[in-house]
């Protein structure tokens, strides 16, 4: 369910021994601020993070507690369809080799309503209907931690694309570097 508190995160020392954490959980109904603080604190203190897809919708505590870590706020997504991601920073180490565009063969384009000053947009796609650009690949500085995030990745068909896998790998290496 989206109201599950992962037991690991309840331990104040949960992150000890981790070099990086990949967040791909979808726990929007968890609203306990102390619990969320326990999740984000290690990242603020320098633990690198990689955020995939539904992780952007987690921990809706009624404020920006989770979204400051993420670097962007998204209230949800539109219908499922293929979309084209434009490379906004081709010289960035994460986006090298990405090319000028990437077609997500299947997906959910998340709506981006707030980008924090600590975030850098690397890729965006235009939303169907109003053609408004939506951030879908970015980095974020969170305290002493580095975060790489992408809303792309709902379907296995997209996540199996070599260009997607290369981008996620470079994002992980960037966050750890």
Residue ranges and their predicted role:
Residues 28-97:
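A glycine-rich, often tryptophan-bearing local segment used as a flexible ligand/cofactor-contacting loop or short
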Residues 72, 79-146:
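Catalytic beta-strand/loop cores that center a nucleophilic Ser/Cys/Thr
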């Amino acid at each position: 369910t989206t109201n599950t508190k992962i037991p690991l995160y309840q331990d104040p020392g949960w992150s000890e021994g981790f070099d990086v954490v990949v967040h791909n959980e979808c726990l929007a109904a968890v609203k306990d601020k102390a619990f969320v603080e326990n999740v984000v604190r290690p990242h603020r203190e320098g633990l690198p993070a990689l955020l995939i897809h539904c992780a952007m919708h987690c921990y809706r505590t009624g404020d920006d507690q989770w979204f400051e870590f993420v670097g962007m706020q998204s209230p949800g997504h539109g219908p499922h369809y293929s979309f084209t991601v434009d490379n906004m920073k081709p010289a960035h180490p994460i986006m090298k080799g990405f090319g000028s565009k990437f077609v997500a063969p299947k997906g959910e384009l998340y709506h981006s309503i707030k980008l924090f000053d600590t975030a850098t947009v690397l890729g965006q796609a235009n939303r169907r209907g109003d053609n408004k650009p939506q951030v879908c690949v970015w980095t974020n500085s969170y305290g002493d931690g580095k975060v790489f995030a992408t809303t792309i990745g709902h379907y296995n068909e997209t996540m199996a694309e070599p260009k997607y896998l290369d981008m996620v790998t470079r994002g992980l290496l960037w966050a750890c570097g």
